[in-house]
């Protein structure tokens, strides 16, 4: 008993020293979590020996001590991975590596530089929710560390890693609870993101690097301007038949630009539907995805889609274009979706081989 008391005193003194020093050195924070793990181990041993109090402190149950020890081990190992990377010399506060921040969405990641995103439901300023987004999210994978930026769009908070868009907060979840009309607007960085059927535009928003790269590879886009934080509007000039009157309908349709491989993240843009040469805002139009490539690969891929059946409405059999001008007879599989949001989720969650070309669009049914 006396030995346990002495060890606990030394351990807790060291923990208090870390609080007082307020260090910005990652090595000190690794040592802090090492002693937090040791404290849990001492409590666990004391409880095993039948002690319910030690040094006038209540000894937690075995389950509580074990759970906290596992969390301390996880954080210690995560920080050691970051320490062995190029980010070890950054300034790190004890708050940056706290358990509370670690468990905040996206969970299981070290994060820094948080800021508030406000979501207003049903246009009611009194019916709002606040979420935390992060400018630096550290994703640890085995011995490597990648830093990504938290981004925001109408659907939620997300980051893009290895070409995959991952949402760690989805606004529709709270809309189900607090919104009558299931409509909201997002306030972030001094900008407002409205429902995709009425996209707010501003020339003051800087577009992310990934969109600049995409537009550089797609010269067909003749005019660009910022739409909202993390997105950019691309308006392509489409010749309207002279006989068709201009109704002035402000309806917009959100559309995903074509991506050539899984490494290209889906990019949301907005096309003004007054250009009716291609897109119509009627109820018979459904979002689609064409997958083009080797027939056998597509057949295997279509079989794998069964476990993602909630992310699409229907999938076609393998088909080909025919005609004397068709030079490349690649196989095609087409998927349809109930909404563009469902299509976005499919493209962000389903792994598509790099040998398959992915293109998006709309089809009247």
UniProtKB/Swiss-Prot annotation:
Keywords: Activator, DNA replication, DNA-binding, Early protein, Host nucleus, Isopeptide bond, Phosphoprotein, Repressor, Transcription, Transcription regulation, Ubl conjugation. Residues 285-365 are annotated as: DNA-binding domain. One of its GO terms (biological process) is DNA-templated transcription. The modification Phosphoserine is found at residue 243. Residues 1-200 are annotated as: Transactivation domain. GO terms for cellular component: host cell nucleus; host cytoskeleton. There is a cross-link at residue 292 (Glycyl lysine isopeptide (Lys-Gly) (interchain with G-Cter in SUMO)). It is found in: Host nucleus. InterPro entries: E2/EBNA1_C_sf, Nucleotide-bd_a/b_plait_sf, Papillomavirus_E2_C, PPV_E2_N, Reg_prot_E2, Regulatory_protein_E2_N, Regulatory_protein_E2_N_1, Regulatory_protein_E2_N_2. Disulfide bonds: none annotated. Phosphorylated. Phosphorylation at Ser-243 mediates binding to host Brd4 and is required for host chromosome binding. Sumoylation plays a regulatory role in E2 transcriptional activity. Its main location: host cell. GO terms for molecular function: DNA binding; DNA-binding transcription factor activity; nucleotide binding. Plays a role in the initiation of viral DNA replication. A dimer of E2 interacts with a dimer of E1 in order to improve specificity of E1 DNA binding activity. Once the complex recognizes and binds DNA at specific sites, the E2 dimer is removed from DNA. E2 also regulates viral transcription through binding to the E2RE response element (5'-ACCNNNNNNGGT-3') present in multiple copies in the regulatory regions of the viral genome. Activates or represses transcription depending on E2RE's position with regards to proximal promoter elements including the TATA-box. HAMAP family: PPV_E2. HPV16, in comparison to HPV types 6 and 11, is more often associated with malignant genital cancers in humans. Binds DNA as homodimer. Interacts with protein E1; this interaction greatly increases E1 DNA-binding activity. Interacts with protein L1; this interaction enhances E2-dependent replication and transcription activation. Interacts with protein L2; this interaction inhibits E2 transcriptional activity but not DNA replication function E2. Interacts with protein E7; this interaction inhibits E7 oncogenic activity. Interacts with host TAF1; this interaction modulates E2-dependent transcriptional regulation. Interacts with host BRD4; this interaction mediates E2 transcriptional activation function. Belongs to the papillomaviridae E2 protein family. This is Regulatory protein E2. The gene is E2.
